[in-house]
């Protein structure tokens, strides 16, 4: 028994050594890890090679659909918004609300950063929000640390709940229950992190003076909606809705405290809506496709292909949800939003090709790691 236990740890030990100690590129380390896991299963656990290979293939397919499909779509929407110049409008809007750097950190790094992470994932929030904070006068290292800390809870759901949905697929757990449990685990951290961000901004606990209530509500305003949304819809929307509520609550309390919010120069309401249109559409489409709208949900989920890839006993059902997949909904939102923002179909196609080029190594990494996990499960 102990021998089997030790052999089962070999793939995990390899990943720890190759990634954490040697510093090997993730794509290479995970691919070698997959090969080691297959050899381990066949030679040490006496699994039929055809079963082992089909289990790995199931994981690779899962890595492509839905994981990389969602990542592709999320990065496409983000890049569309950037290329059209709309991201600049959003950044200007957020930075015009107050001159208090502590509150700006709550709005930009915490609220907007959480929103970007829930839409695009990939640590996009850290890069974008750190750049905004640096332009507003924060030191580069300070801004980077603040954004990394702010992103610590948002990554639990990633882009449209992808990590939780993937965990549900791999473990055969209910994704709605899993999403709800994750939000409950995060509640204390979600309330605590805004206080840490304010302290990091002011470089002292005294930085909380005068904005303790705003800081508290910035966290509570994210935590409560996350729990409620996860309870009734699943893992796709909690981070997105929670971050939006946090921004709204923080801005509203700031307005009450200061008595006014600066106007955004040269930007009307229509321009702001235009800039946010892809994200608004993502929210609407994902909401309509959820179990909250049974007629739409039933129609979209009816267009599904069921695969049984594993050739051994008790194979998992691998559903390919062509219409209800978050990737399809996000892509559609990006295309419509891109048209609203004035981009042509040819421009959007070029954006899509560029995104495909950038995620090549990531695709290899994800497919290898999910394939590895599936072999270990079977």
Q: Which sequence ranges carry the predicted segments?
A:
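Long, contiguous bundles of hydrophobic transmembrane helices that form the permeation core
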Residues: 1-7, 190-314
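Hydrophobic mid-bilayer segments of alpha-helices in multi-pass membrane transport proteins
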Residues: 7-16, 24-46, 68-74, 215, ...
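Membrane-embedded alpha-helical segments and adjacent helix-loop junctions characteristic
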Residues: 53-136, 342-378
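Transmembrane helix-loop junctions in multi-pass membrane proteins
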Residues: 45-53, 86, 119, 161-176, ...
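Alpha-helical transmembrane segments of multipass membrane proteins
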Residues: 16-17, 38-42, 114-115, 166-167, ...
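Transmembrane helical segments that form the transport core of multi-pass membrane transport proteins
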Residues: 242, 261-378
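Hydrophobic transmembrane alpha-helices that form the pore/transport pathway of multi-pass ion
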Residues: 104-209
């Amino acid at each position: 028994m102990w021998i089997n236990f030790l052999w089962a740890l070999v793939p995990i030990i390899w990943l720890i050594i190759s990634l954490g100690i040697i510093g090997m590129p993730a794509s290479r380390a995970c691919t070698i890890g997959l090969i080691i896991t297959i050899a381990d299963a066949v030679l040490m656990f006496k699994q039929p090679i055809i079963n082992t290979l089909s289990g790995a293939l199931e994981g690779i397919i899962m890595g492509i659909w839905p994981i990389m499909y969602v990542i592709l779509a999320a990065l496409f929407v983000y890049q569309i918004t950037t290329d059209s110049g709309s991201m600049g409008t959003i950044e200007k809007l957020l930075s015009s609300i107050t001159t208090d750097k502590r509150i700006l950190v709550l709005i930009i790094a915490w609220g907007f950063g959480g929103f970007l992470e829930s839409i695009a994932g990939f640590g996009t929030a850290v890069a974008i929000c750190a750049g905004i904070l640096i332009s507003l006068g924060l030191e580069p290292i300070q801004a980077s640390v603040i954004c990394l800390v702010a992103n610590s809870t948002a990554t639990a759901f990633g882009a449209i709940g992808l990590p939780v949905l993937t965990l549900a697929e791999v473990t055969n757990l209910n994704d709605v229950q899993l999403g709800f449990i994750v939000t409950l685990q995060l509640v204390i951290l979600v309330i605590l992190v805004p206080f840490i961000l304010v302290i990091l901004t002011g470089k002292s606990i005294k930085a909380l003076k005068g904005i303790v209530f705003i800081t508290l509500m910035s966290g509570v305003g994210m935590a409560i909606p996350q729990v409620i949304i996860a309870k009734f819809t699943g893992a796709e929307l909690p981070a997105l809705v929670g971050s939006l509520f946090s921004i709204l609550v923080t801005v509203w309390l700031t307005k009450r405290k200061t008595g006014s919010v600066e106007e955004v120069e040269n930007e009307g309401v229509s321009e702001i809506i235009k800039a946010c249109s892809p994200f608004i559409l993502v929210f609407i489409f994902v909401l309509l496709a959820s179990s909250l709208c049974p007629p739409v949900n039933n129609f979209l989920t009816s267009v599904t292909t069921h695969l049984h890839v594993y050739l051994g006993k008790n194979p998992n059902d691998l559903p390919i949800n062509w219409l209800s997949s978050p990737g399809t909904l996000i892509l559609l939102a990006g295309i419509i939003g891109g048209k609203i923002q004035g981009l042509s179909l040819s421009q959007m196609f070029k954006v899509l090709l560029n995104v495909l080029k950038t995620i090549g190594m990531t695709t290899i990494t994800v497919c290898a790691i999910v394939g590895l996990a599936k072999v270990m499960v079977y």
